[in-house]
Each structure stands twice: as structure tokens, then as C-alpha cells.
Curated annotation (Swiss-Prot):
Cytoplasmic side: 1-32
Organism: Harpagifer antarcticus (Antarctic spiny plunderfish)
Entry-linked Gene3D superfamilies: Preprotein translocase SecE subunit
GO CC, any one term: endoplasmic reticulum membrane
PROSITE patterns: SECE_SEC61G (PS01067)
Name this polypeptide is given: Protein transport protein Sec61 subunit gamma
Keywords: Endoplasmic reticulum, Membrane, Protein transport, Translocation, Transmembrane, Transmembrane helix, Transport
Topology of the protein relative to the lipid bilayer: Single-pass membrane protein
């Protein structure tokens, strides 16, 4: 019986902690959501422009090396 409790107790503690975490979590209000969405959109745009410019630079270099 002691071995069973030794196996079950960590699971029980994890469930208890998880329930406590979910109860403390709150949905973001509209202003906070808009800030997070804007930051994410700006990050996507920056990464897209970086990828575009890297590809723009490497296409002519690749054509010179391979197509030469």
C-alpha cells in the first residue's frame, strides 16, 4: 500500500497545483490582448522582411555561382 501511495502522491500534487493555477489565471482584457496581438504582428512582419531581404540578396549570388 505504501508503494501505491508513493506512486499516486506526485500525481495528486500535480493535479492540485494545476487546478490552483487554472483558478488564478484570468483572460486578458481587450487592451492587453490588443497589445499582445500588435507585438506579435510586428514580430511576424519583421521576420518576414528579414527573410525577404535575405532571399533577395542570395538569389543573384546563387545565379552567379551556379548559372555563371
Amino acid at each position: 500500500m505504501d508503494q501505491v501511495m508513493q506512486f499516486v502522491e506526485p500525481s495528486r500534487q500535480f493535479v492540485k497545483d494545476s487546478i490552483r493555477l487554472v483558478k488564478r489565471c484570468t483572460k486578458p482584457d481587450r487592451k492587453e490582448f490588443q497589445k499582445v496581438a500588435m507585438a506579435t504582428a510586428i514580430g511576424f512582419a519583421i521576420m518576414g522582411f528579414i527573410g525577404f531581404f535575405v532571399k533577395l540578396i542570395h538569389i543573384p549570388i546563387n545565379n552567379i555561382i551556379v548559372g555563371g
